[in-house]
Structure formats: C-alpha cells, structure tokens
Amino acid sequence: MSYSISQIAKALGAEAAGNLDLTVTGAAEPGDAGHDQLALAMSPKYAEALAKGGARAAILWPGAAWQAMGLEAAIFAARPRLAMAGLTAMLDPGQGVASGIHPSAVIDPSAEIGADVSIGPLTVVGARARIGAGSVIGPHCVIGMDAVLGEGAWLREMVSIGARATIGARFIAQPGARIGGDGFSFVTPEVSGAENARKTMGDQGEAKAQAWTRIHSLGAVEIGDDVEVGANCTVDNGTIRNTCIGDGSKLDNLVHVGHNTRIGRDCLLCGQTGVSGSVEIGNNVVLGGQTGVVDNIYIGDGVIAGGGSKILSNVPAGRVIMGYPAVKMDLHTEIYKAQRRLPRLLRDISALKKAVSKPGPSE
C-alpha cells in the first residue's frame, strides 16, 4: 500500500508543498522514519529528530520551513491529532480476517447474515440473530439469540454479544469485550449491614449475617451508532430496562458499565473506569482512567473527571472534577496544597504550644 503526498493531503484536507508525486508506504516517528516513510513531525520539538532519520517527506505544522529541514515534500496539519486520525485510517492494514464465512463457524439457520459479512473460525451465531451488511466478525466470537448488530460492525477475536442486545452501525469491539452479561444484582432476606452502613455513613446496626439472593436480568443492552469498546470491556444487562450507550461514545480497555446505566452521546470513558448500576450520564462526558462512579447518581452534560476520581454524588453539567470524593478541580488543588503544608503547620503549632506553656522569668 502506497500513497502520494498529493493523495494524503487531499484525504486530510490539508495543504502540501514540494514534490507532491512522491510516494510513501507508511508513517513513522521522525528519528525512525525511512526513505519511503512519512515522518510525523507535527511540532518543532519533534522536527529536531528529522536529521536522525531518512524521511523525504513529513507532516509538519503550518508555516514550517520544510526545505530547511532537507525534505522533498511536506504536508501542513493545522490540527495534528485530527490529521493522525485520517492518516492512520488510510494506512491501517487490518487484522487479516478472511472474507466469507469460515467452515468451522456455527450459525443458527434462523440467523440473518447481511451481504459481504465475514465470520471467522469457531464463531457462534445464535437463533434469530441479525448481522448487518459489511460486518467483520473475528474468530471465537459469540453473538447471542435475538441480538442485532448493525452494518459495518468490526468484532475482534473472542468478543461476546449477549442475547437480545441491540447494537447500531459501525460498532467496534476489541478482543475480549463482553456485552450483555448479567447485572451484579443481589439482595438479602432482611436489611443488610451494607445497607445500614450506607444509610448511616458507617453504622451496620444489628444486621445479621445473611446469604445473597440473585436478582435476574430481564433487560438487555442497547448501543447506538459509531460506538467503540476496548479490550475486556464489560457492559451488563439491565435488570428491567435496558442498559444504554449513546451514539459515538468510546469505552477504553477494562471499562465496566453496570446494569441499568444510561450513557449519552460522544462520551469518553478511559481505562479501568467503573460505573455502578442505574447511573445517568449525559452527553460529551469524559471520565479519566480509574474513575469510579457510585450507583444511582446523575452526571450532567460536558462533565470532565480527572483520572482516579471517585464520584459519590450528582455532578451538574459542565463541571470539571477530581479527587476522592470528587470535587471541583480547583478546590481539589487547594486541598492538596493544604495537605502538603500540614507537616510544617503541625510543627509550628507544636513550637507555639511549647512557647506559651514555658514559664517566663517573672513566674
């Protein structure tokens, strides 16, 4: 696969200069780029390494003096990471899944398979499942009964889609993703110590030890268009209503979404984030890595949570939060600074106590 500088610039909607017919076969960091690779030197700090590599062409920032860098051609990207999105889409070689349906795949006769669908080895497709046209299903996947998968889906190896799940177009699931497991719902015959402790903020009361009884999941999972889930990501079925993820949302590796939770459009949930059950998350919310969200709360549109935040109460729209418990980021910074001063403050207090308690000459 090779592209000319002209083709790449046109695809990216970017300006280019120099030998626009020069072709490249891949991309690389500036210091590692070979003769036929496009160097990614999108800011001056990266361009310094161009001399260590052999690239003849590079993606640079607007106005860069490309000829002084010894290049034969250059593409100018106003927004580098957006250019990366387009470039990597052009150069992605894929995962090598063969076209057609592998002979070892087990497909129920009542399943509906769209046109140009590829299904890998040892994949199982359940009764009445529907797979949209142009989808690619990798090896060892499971698509449960009555599940619906939209057009252009891309399931990597060992992905499972539970029964009755409904998923929109262009869904992408990385290896080991699990959509539609049962929710983590259990109850005791009488009020438990955990319930008392939560209600009283620490007192278990007289609750006795009891066994847990399972609450079955009658709901399913409903996912919109253009959603992506990372490796080993899990999304649980709803108890009665469906667990929902809106159009364009992206879930990183090891993200967990609990039963009944509803996530809006274009949200970003970073690695190891855990969302408890029955949470309402608005649109365009960003939860940094290892964020924890307690159950039965609301997070408004446009909220951003710093990595490691623990969200224990409702968050109004547009707020930037951080910490455990999560508070406004500027307040968290003030608290952190105050904590850093505590040892010195305690030493000062100790010294003052000694000074005022020491008898004076007149005493």
UniProtKB/Swiss-Prot annotation:
Alphabetically sorted, this entry's keywords are:
Acyltransferase, Lipid A biosynthesis, Lipid biosynthesis, Lipid metabolism, Repeat, Transferase
Instruction: Identify the GO cellular component terms for this protein.
Output: membrane
Fetch the Pfam families from UniProt.
Hexapep, LpxD
Q: What's its top-level EC category?
A: transferase
Q: Could you tell me the EC number(s) of this protein?
A: 2.3.1.191
- Gene Ontology molecular function terms on file: N-acyltransferase activity
Q: In which pathway does it act?
A: Bacterial outer membrane biogenesis; LPS lipid A biosynthesis
Q: Where is the active site?
A: H259
**GO terms of biological process kind:** lipid A biosynthetic process
Q: Which InterPro entries match?
A: Hexapep (IPR001451), Hexapep_transf_CS (IPR018357), LpxD (IPR007691), Trimer_LpxA-like_sf (IPR011004), UDP_GlcNAc_AcTrfase_non-rep (IPR020573)
Q: According to the lineage, what is the superkingdom?
A: Bacteria
**Reactions that this protein is recorded to catalyse:** a UDP-3-O-[(3R)-3-hydroxyacyl]-alpha-D-glucosamine + a (3R)-hydroxyacyl-[ACP] = a UDP-2-N,3-O-bis[(3R)-3-hydroxyacyl]-alpha-D-glucosamine + holo-[ACP] + H(+)
Q: Which HAMAP family match?
A: LpxD (MF_00523)
Give the multimer and partner information. Homotrimer.
Q: Which family does it belong to?
A: Belongs to the transferase hexapeptide repeat family. LpxD subfamily.
User: What biological function has been recorded for the protein in this entry?
Assistant: Catalyzes the N-acylation of UDP-3-O-acylglucosamine using 3-hydroxyacyl-ACP as the acyl donor. Is involved in the biosynthesis of lipid A, a phosphorylated glycolipid that anchors the lipopolysaccharide to the outer membrane of the cell.
Q: What is this protein called?
A: UDP-3-O-acylglucosamine N-acyltransferase
Q: Which gene encodes it?
A: lpxD
